[in-house]
């Protein structure tokens, strides 16, 4: 009996996977909807009755689940970088010529892959032994949220690829223009564009709801593969074989007239832009040969072997209804134009930043004027010019703060409120503190913070940890369940890493990259930084010794750690048990041979996957470089090394094996 049930389940599963491929990949279905639905319902019934036979690659997972997702934050195995950008064809042509020259000098025949840049939500798919193991959002490039339960519901995401291989893939999840307009019309809270709607659907906590939305995906890049793949177009052939959906407008270019042919392709895609059923905002070019990519390497921001050509922003005409003045957490004053609602590139626009008084004067703008509106980079609304002047004179920003009424000061082209008690500045600090990039207090939206602040329930970040949130129960929008969720989120925030707390303090010029520089130079705790800053002169010398920290940043760090208000906040959080030091796993070890050494890797290793080995070495204080340059301290060489070894030898860089490294330092402690 058991064997018969298991055999039927396996047979149904194989049949449904075959039909899925015929329908979604080959576009040639061999069975009708009734047959398909009947088989899927039978499989679902059997798996529910015999759960011991259910597997992670079952097609029934496409139905979703009623279990609530918690979207845990997970570290990416590889940094998820941005792309270099070009905004005109001359810039793009220069990049193509540069890649061709570098490829030729290294003995490569240049080939370039091109494809439309989808304006959706980036996702990273991890396959282990051929089965989808996790699906991470891009997040901050280092950490993303695992939304696998929701991604499993997307029909064009294979749950199993039929071979026991490991893959890490990048893709773009999207919703078509037609579906966006149809769905958005039915929602209580509508979305500004298709990308935001896609993101909202992807983050729904109940995957049974997600299955009802027509999300789709294009896979466009391989970050890691256990297969031997040498080129992008070979990789795409393999991905198509596995059942992944690839953009049909992808094209490969090589040979004579390379630059001219690519520019013609880009212009053709841009001309057809409005005919695409989904939003696109440019074209992405990638060097086709993976070995050449390996040599070209990366910056901290983007791969050198790829570039995105951004289309010129679409424009529309609207009328300025009003101009309001906003105050940021730094006190910066920003004028904003409220305009009559207009649709641009799939998004409804109702406001646009005017930057400063100089910008307003340069375009001669005032209330009632008719203006041309764009979305720069298809993201940021901008007033480009006055089409019809219906007012007299230009709008003038008041010389006092709209929040606290104190006089403003001018720094460069911008006006600032320097009153530390300014309500809007304080509220901006609280919003920043709670934001996802900082303490990530789920449930404390900007609207909720504004309500709590305006009701005098909170007046600083500290109040979030002293206020009795039970007082909110019974108020409009605050039931017992929501209040408990808020309390739980606030409590969980106490466990954030020290670097997040340091970022959340909003210290001028102290962004995450500077914080990581401090941590990697033994300034990895509140006590270490505050102790150093007690001696201003010594602190300045020490900070300026850190590559990447200049005088302005150093002075702002010293000033902040001598500010009583900031120190009192740190001490308050310390008293609540917040982490005031980076966990040892993230901190460098000063005594290690590897501390401060810049290294690169080529070849493969039996003992560790490359990304694991890189992680182990960087935790000893070394700095990983993705490409070989004269600044490298050593190249770690494994089996079947690539062209990096030749380049390192030419530059006289020290060559080490894994055996050499392990003789010098214990990687596993």
Swiss-Prot record:
What residues make up the catalytic site?
A: 117 (n6-amp-lysine intermediate)
Keyword Cytoplasm in annotation? no
> Catalyses which reaction?
NAD(+) + (deoxyribonucleotide)n-3'-hydroxyl + 5'-phospho-(deoxyribonucleotide)m = (deoxyribonucleotide)n+m + AMP + beta-nicotinamide D-nucleotide
Which positions are annotated as binding NAD(+)? Answer: 33-37, 82-83, 115, 138, 172, 286, 310
Q: Where is the signal peptide?
A: none
> What GO molecular function terms would the record report?
DNA ligase (NAD+) activity; metal ion binding
Summarize where Zn(2+) binds, as residue positions.
401, 404, 417, 422
UniProt domain BRCT: residue ranges: 589-669
Q: Which domain of life is it from?
A: Bacteria
Q: Does the keyword Metal-binding apply?
A: yes
Q: Which Pfam families match?
A: BRCT, DNA_ligase_aden, DNA_ligase_OB
- Names of the cofactor(s): Mg(2+); Mn(2+)
Tell me the keywords, alphabetical order. DNA damage, DNA repair, DNA replication, Ligase, Magnesium, Manganese, Metal-binding, NAD, Zinc
**Family matches, as InterPro entries:** BRCT_dom, BRCT_dom_sf, DNA_ligase, DNAligase_adenylation, DNAligase_N, NA-bd_OB-fold, NAD_DNA_ligase_OB, RuvA_2-like
Q: Which GO terms describe its biological process?
A: DNA repair; DNA replication
* Entry EC number(s): 6.5.1.2
Q: Which family does it belong to?
A: Belongs to the NAD-dependent DNA ligase family. LigA subfamily.
Q: Which NCBIfam families match?
A: dnlj (TIGR00575), PRK07956.1 (NF005932), PRK14350.1 (NF010930)
Role this protein plays:
DNA ligase that catalyzes the formation of phosphodiester linkages between 5'-phosphoryl and 3'-hydroxyl groups in double-stranded DNA using NAD as a coenzyme and as the energy source for the reaction. It is essential for DNA replication and repair of damaged DNA.
Please state what the protein is called: DNA ligase
Organism from which the protein derives: Borrelia duttonii (strain Ly)
The gene name on file is ligA
């Amino acid at each position: 009996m058991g064997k018969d049930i298991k055999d039927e389940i396996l047979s149904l599963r194989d049949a449904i996977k075959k039909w899925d491929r015929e329908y979604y990949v080959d576009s040639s279905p061999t069975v009708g909807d009734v047959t398909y639905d009947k088989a899927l319902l039978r499989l679902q019934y059997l798996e529910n009755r015999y759960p011991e036979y259910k597997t992670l690659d079952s097609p029934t997972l496409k139905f979703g689940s009623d279990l609530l997702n918690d979207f845990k934050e997970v570290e990416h195995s590889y940094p998820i970088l941005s792309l270099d950008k070009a905004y005109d064809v001359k810039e793009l042509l220069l990049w193509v010529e540069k890649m061709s020259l570098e490829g030729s000098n290294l003995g490569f025949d240049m080939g370039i892959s091109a494809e439309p840049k989808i304006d959706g939500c980036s996702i990273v798919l991890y396959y282990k032994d051929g089965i989808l193991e996790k699906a991470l959002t891009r997040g901050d490039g280092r950490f993303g949220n695992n939304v696998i339960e929701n991604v499993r519901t997307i029909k064009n995401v294979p749950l199993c690829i039929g071979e026991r291989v490991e893959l890490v893939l990048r893709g773009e999840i999207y919703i078509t223009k037609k579906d966006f307009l149809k769905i958005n019309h039915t929602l209580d809270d509508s979305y500004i564009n298709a990308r935001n709607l896609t993101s909202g659907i992807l983050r729904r906590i109940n995957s049974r709801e997600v299955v009802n939305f027509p999300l789709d995906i294009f896979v466009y890049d391989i970050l890691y593969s256990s297969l031997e793949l040498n080129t992008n177009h070979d990789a795409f052939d393999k991905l198509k074989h596995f059942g992944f959906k690839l953009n049909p407008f992808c094209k490969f270019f090589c040979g004579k007239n390379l630059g001219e042919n690519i520019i013609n392709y880009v212009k053709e895609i841009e001309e057809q832009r409005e005919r695409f059923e989904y939003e696109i905002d440019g074209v992405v070019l990638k060097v086709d040969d993976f070995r050449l990519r390996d040599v070209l390497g990366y910056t901290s921001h983007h791969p050198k072997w790829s570039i995105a050509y951004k289309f010129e922003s679409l424009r529309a005409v609207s009328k300025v209804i009003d101009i309001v003045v906003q105050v940021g957490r730094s006190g910066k004053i920003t004028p904003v134009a409220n305009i009559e609602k207009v649709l641009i590139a799939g998004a409804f626009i109702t406001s646009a930043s005017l930057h400063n008084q100089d910008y307003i004067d340069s375009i001669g703008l005032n209330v009632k004027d008719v203006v041309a509106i764009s979305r720069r980079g298809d993201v940021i609304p901008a007033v480009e010019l006055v089409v019809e002047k219906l007012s007299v004179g230009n709008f003038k920003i008041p010389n006092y703060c709209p929040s606290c009424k104190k006089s403003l000061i001018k720094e460069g082209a911008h006006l600032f409120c320097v009153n530390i008690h300014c309500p809007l500045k304080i509220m901006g600090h609280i919003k920043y503190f709670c934001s996802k990039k900082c303490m990530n207090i789920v449930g404390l939206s900007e609207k909720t913070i504004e309500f709590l602040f305006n009701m005098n329930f909170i007046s600083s970040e500290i109040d979030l940890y002293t206020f009795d949130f039970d007082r909110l129960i019974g108020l409009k929008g605050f039931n017992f369940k929501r209040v408990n969720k808020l309390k739980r989120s606030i409590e969980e925030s106490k466990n954030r890493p020290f670097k997040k707390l340091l970022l959340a303090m909003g210290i001028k010029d102290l962004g995450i990259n500077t914080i990581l520089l401090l941590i990697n130079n033994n300034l990895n705790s509140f006590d270490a930084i505050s102790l150093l800053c007690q001696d201003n002169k010594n602190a300045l010398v020490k900070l300026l010794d850190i590559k990447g920290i200049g005088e302005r940043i150093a002075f702002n760090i010293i000033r902040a750690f001598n500010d009583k208000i900031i120190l009192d906040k740190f001490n308050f959080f310390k008293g609540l048990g917040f982490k005031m030091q980076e966990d040892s796993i993230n901190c460098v070890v000063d005594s290690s041979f590897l501390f401060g050494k810049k290294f690169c890797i080529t070849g493969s290793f039996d003992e560790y996957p490359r990304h694991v080995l890189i992680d182990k070495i960087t935790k000893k204080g070394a700095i990983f470089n993705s490409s070989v340059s004269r600044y490298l301290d050593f190249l770690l060489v494994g089996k079947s090394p690539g062209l990096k070894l030749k380049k390192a030898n030419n530059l006289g860089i020290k060559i080490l094996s894994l055996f050499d490294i392990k003789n010098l330092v214990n990687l596993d402690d």
